[in-house]
Amino acid sequence: MKFFMAMKPPTVTHQEKQVRVVNGKPVFYEPAELRNARAKLRANLASQKPLSPYDRPVELVVTWCFPRGKHRDGEYRATKPDTDNLQKLLKDCMTEVGFWKDDCLVCREIVEKFWAEIPGIYIRIEELT
């Protein structure tokens, strides 16, 4: 399966959870920006989810296309956020929406970040044999 979600990719990542102390105990929470990014990803992914979740090993290919600004279309984005942090939030959302039973099924992964004329996230999933 493959699809493109035309959207401005979120730059906030799963690593940006916050902590506060309540009654002497640490409580972790998601700031509003992270909650909004998660909701945006879930909404876009929901319309693309497979009829039944993957339950076998898969390859996941993701191309993050960020608004190019002053950069050339197709130029690699060698700035933050890091690909591993972007992927964590995306794969968590894909699990929540029902792409697979668990993201541990992603056994091969290719991730790229580019500056692009048309921003969005390209995703391809293939079952491994």
Question: How would you label these PLM feature ranges?
Answer:
Residues 1-129:
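Acidic, proline/glycine-enriched N-terminal capping motif
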